[in-house]
């Protein structure tokens, strides 16, 4: 059975693992998922990630991050553009998340970028998700 929305699966697995207070979560590998996870790492929402290229398929391991009170750093991971309803934005209309306190992740012609970097580069694209 094929997966309809692998990005939604990534976000849901991270959300569920954080609610269960897991240290790591393992996902099926894809280049887009790695780019999204790299952005989460750069922005300080997760500790890091690693890729395991073993047979029969590669996996992506995400190392989750918690506050000292064991509360997850990520409060909300929300999918914006979905397979049934794609959401695109121009460079001038990229929305702020929580007045600039959160980030949105876009798929652009320059690759997967945060909303802030997309504004700086002057490119628009598909809004994949919001994180705060």
Task: Please annotate each region the language model reported.
Residues 1-132:
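Core subunits and conserved enzymes of cellular information-processing
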């Amino acid at each position: 059975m094929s997966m309809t929305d692998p990005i939604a699966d990534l976000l849901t697995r991270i959300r569920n693992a954080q609610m269960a207070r897991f240290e790591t979560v393992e996902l099926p590998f894809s280049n887009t998922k790695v780019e999204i996870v790299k952005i989460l790492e750069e922005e300080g929402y997760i500790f890091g990630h690693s890729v395991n290229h073993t047979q029969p398929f590669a996996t992506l391991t995400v190392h989750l991050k918690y506050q000292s009170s064991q509360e997850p750093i990520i409060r909300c991971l929300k999918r914006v553009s979905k397979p049934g309803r794609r959401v695109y934005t121009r460079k001038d209309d990229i929305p702020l998340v929580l007045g600039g306190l959160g980030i949105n992740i876009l798929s652009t012609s320059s690759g997967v970028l945060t909303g802030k970097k997309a504004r700086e580069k002057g490119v628009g694209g598909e809004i994949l998700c919001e994180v705060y």
